[in-house]
Amino acid sequence: MGFSETFGCISNIHSDDPSTWENKLFITFDIDWAHYDVLSDIIDVVERADVAAIWFVTRDSSLFEHLRANPKFDLWIHPNSNFLLAGETRKGATASEMIDRLIEIVPEAKDVRSHFTTQSSRLLEIFADKGSTHD
């Protein structure tokens, strides 16, 4: 297996097929606090390495079209429930609204990772209802 093939996208994992995950590395990037220039540089480095990567989306960016153009990149939603837990509604008044806002930004996203490992049966149910296949 070559260097490039060592890296995979989590959305391609099938639990019943070890070849989709055994001996693979999975790189993820959280763009939440990344400055545009830093994010652009990181994208360039990953593309030069010709490896797969997952990008966790928490806000809109003009770089998404560039990311979408690379078939080795997956865009996932990355909801931050801390606002809801603190009683703030600026990102959505409910978990469903918060997730809908992110899906508007990345409608093709089928996968999700919550911030700060905030997870619950109800959130998992909402993610699945919205089409998530991996969390």
Give the ranges of each region predicted by the language model.
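Substrate-binding cleft/loops of secretory-pathway carbohydrate-active enzymes
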Residues: 128
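Active-site beta->alpha N-cap acidic-glycine motif
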Residues: 2-74
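Metal-dependent polysaccharide deacetylase catalytic core of the NodB/CE4 family, i.e.
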Residues: 49-125, 133
